[in-house]
Amino acid sequence: MRLSRYFLPILKENPREAEIVSHRLMLRAGMIRQQGQGSFSWLPLGKRVLDKVCQIIREEQNRAGALEILMPTIQSADLWRESGRYNDYGKEMLRIKDRQDRDMLYGPTNEEMVTEIFRAYVKSYKDLPLNLYHIQWKFRDEVRPRFGVMRSREFLMKDAYSFDLDFEGARSAYNRMFVSYLRTFTRMGLQAIPMRADTGPIGGDLSHEFIILADTGESQVFCHRDYLSLAVPGANTDFANDGEIADIVKTWTTPYAATDEMHDEAAWEKVPESDKVSARGIEVGHIFHFGEKYSKPMGAKVTGPDGKDHFASGGSYGIGPSRLVAAIIEASHDENGIIWPDAVAPFDIGLINMKVGDADCDRVSEELNAAFTAAGKDVLYDDTDQRPGGKFATADLIGLPWQVIVGPRGVAAGEVEIKNRRTGERETLPIADAKKRFGVAA
């Protein structure tokens, strides 16, 4: 992609309304545009990151056996009345009427709708277990939306919902999602710690929030230092092996970890002082088992092997992709801008032509752009006539993992410079070696 043809509305000054780093950098880097209180448009650079975050989520949900669907944003109030939850969200839920004067709502969550789908089609234990997920925009009328997309009124959510015959099956489904979340956040370059948490208005009796430690976090969190070095399950994890998955969950839930709401001072006192970590944290995911909370009032029953009807035992598993983008920035930035982990970077390489119009610089830049692209790399080629200092500032601000710098002196010597955005290290390489560095075949 040529920067001269790309829509990247960079802001030179820090926006006054931005209270935290991620909000400031997302506005400055031209990732988002605020359209109203707690409402944002995602511009090309931001949308690329959001899409990559969603793709990782999809891959890990699919790996764990969940199946993707898509449910509508507008829901019938009747479903929520069935579950008895219509008034639980109060003014946070946007309520509307259609032209037939029927009560509708803009869904803040989807337990009722997915339960209606389940009860319509699933009648036997032979069709279980079942885990359905979707990625959809949600709306909650926050009293005080703030921190950009970190706490907005309209946001993107991945919601998964599991259905099983009994608690034993539901616990296995919960464990699979637990491990899936560990892998998901690690792939995005985040160190997420599962902490015992309250279930809130959704209800239930087993709940974990996945928290990343950050000074700008909204929650006070407490955990054992062991969490900072625990090994995350690999890509070869067998999600069909309930015993293996349960062992992983046990390892990740044995040390103490809790949000402020669930903090147990007596248990905390038993943790050695040298192992205590007390910090602010950002919630990036929430999973919980809610049993028959929705299946019972909504009549979602299946026939068991005993020939009797059983209310399905359910769980809900949420990740906010739009919030995750901000969380990644909070965890990975410096004074010059964003530092994207490779897996979610909008482009793999920022190719900088230091002297556009110089025949040799243009030739080498075009050659590298074509070679990197052919090798499967996403390249943002800065072919603008901006000054070199401005080009470097833009590249650092938007945080691409690698910068390949093409200048007159280097080209004359048959070389280019490569900069690692995370470490700041620079290396001068022959052009052929620079190609090999990024997977271009000789």
From Swiss-Prot:
Name recorded for this polypeptide: Proline--tRNA ligase
GO terms (BP aspect): prolyl-tRNA aminoacylation
InterPro entries per UniProt: aa-tRNA-synt_IIb (IPR002314), aa-tRNA-synth_II (IPR006195), aa-tRNA-synth_II/BPL/LPL (IPR045864), Anticodon-bd (IPR004154), Anticodon-bd_dom_sf (IPR036621), Pro-tRNA-ligase_IIa (IPR002316), Pro-tRNA-synth_IIa_bac-type (IPR004500), Pro-tRNA_synthetase (IPR050062)
Enzyme class, UniProt record, top EC level: ligase
Reported function: Catalyzes the attachment of proline to tRNA(Pro) in a two-step reaction: proline is first activated by ATP to form Pro-AMP and then transferred to the acceptor end of tRNA(Pro).
Example of a GO MF term: proline-tRNA ligase activity
EC id: 6.1.1.15
Keywords noted in UniProt: Aminoacyl-tRNA synthetase, ATP-binding, Cytoplasm, Ligase, Nucleotide-binding, Protein biosynthesis
Main location: cytoplasm
PANTHER family, sorted: MITOCHONDRIAL RIBOSOME PROTEIN L39/PROLYL-TRNA LIGASE FAMILY MEMBER, PROLINE--TRNA LIGASE
Subcellular location(s) of the protein: Cytoplasm
Gene: proS
Keyword Nucleotide-binding recorded: yes
Quaternary state and interactors: Homodimer.
GO cellular component: cytosol
Native species: Mesorhizobium japonicum (strain LMG 29417 / CECT 9101 / MAFF 303099) (Mesorhizobium loti (strain MAFF 303099))
Domain of life, per lineage: Bacteria
Lineage: Bacteria, Pseudomonadati, Pseudomonadota, Alphaproteobacteria, Hyphomicrobiales
UniProt record similarity statement: Belongs to the class-II aminoacyl-tRNA synthetase family. ProS type 2 subfamily.
